[in-house]
From Swiss-Prot:
InterPro entries the UniProt entry points to: NHR-like_dom_sf, Nucl_hrmn_rcpt_lig-bd, Nuclear_hormone_rcpt_NR3, Nuclear_hrmn_rcpt
Coiled-coil intervals, chain numbering: none
Pfam families assigned: Hormone_recep
GO molecular function: DNA binding; steroid binding; zinc ion binding
Zinc finger (NR C4-type): 1-11
Primary gene name: PGR
Oligomeric form and interacting partners: Interacts with SMARD1 and UNC45A. Interacts with CUEDC2; the interaction promotes ubiquitination, decreases sumoylation, and represses transcriptional activity. Interacts with PIAS3; the interaction promotes sumoylation of PR in a hormone-dependent manner, inhibits DNA-binding, and alters nuclear export. Interacts with SP1; the interaction requires ligand-induced phosphorylation by ERK1/2-MAPK. Interacts with PRMT2. Interacts with NCOA2 and NCOA1. Interacts with KLF9. Interacts with GTF2B.
Keyword Ubl conjugation attached: yes
Top-rank taxon: Eukaryota
Protein name (record): Progesterone receptor
Iron found in the keyword field: no
Annotated segments matching region AF2: 71-180
Length: 180
């Protein structure tokens, strides 16, 4: 009764959701399948409960162990495509051309964030006002995290990797009007 995971599972089995709305559109079978797909891990037992623990954790030799939980697999499958800035390296660089390219890139990335969030499990079940609020409060963090991740992944954090066609090193950044 005191285990939060067990209480959550029982509430979900009864048709309750975190947002406070009941599953009106879903039948009980769909709800149970969704709960099975995103299983809550059981608490680990103490050493004196080893017999009960071995009864809960038994694997047959031919049973495969999942390396990635279903939620991680889902997130990997909805990973957004690579977005290009449309920056023309052949033209002389001016602060307005760089700023224009960054604005166009931010617009494309924002659309990508909205599309990505709509494909997240449970996001569309939220009220539309809640969806808008979540995107309003998180878009900048998601975009900055994406910039940091791309910079780390592609150029080992030595440059700012905005897009494959717009990578700024420290010297180029100092030469731009953004640095001062």
């Amino acid at each position: 009764k005191n285990c939060p995971a067990c209480r959550l599972r029982k509430c979900c089995q009864a048709g309750m959701v975190l947002g406070g709305r009941k599953f009106k559109k879903f039948n009980k079978v769909r709800v149970m399948r969704a709960l099975d797909a995103v299983a809550v891990p059981q608490p680990v037992g103490l050493p004196n409960e080893s017999q009960a623990l071995t009864q809960r954790i038994t694997f047959s030799p031919n049973q495969e162990i999942q390396l990635f939980p279903p939620l991680i697999n889902l997130l990997l499958s909805i990973e957004p495509d690579v977005i290009y800035a449309g920056y023309d390296n052949t033209k002389p660089e001016t602060s307005s051309s760089l700023l224009t390219s960054l604005n166009h890139l931010a617009e494309r990335q924002l659309l990508s964030v909205v599309k990505w969030s709509k494909s997240l499990p449970g996001f569309r079940n939220l009220h539309i006002d809640d969806q808008i609020t979540l995107i309003q409060y998180s878009w900048m963090s998601l975009m900055v995290f994406g910039l940091g991740w791309r910079s780390y992944k592609h150029v080992s954090g030595q440059m700012l990797y905005f897009a494959p066609d717009l990578i700024l090193n420290e010297q180029r950044m100092k030469e731009s009007s953004f640095y001062s």
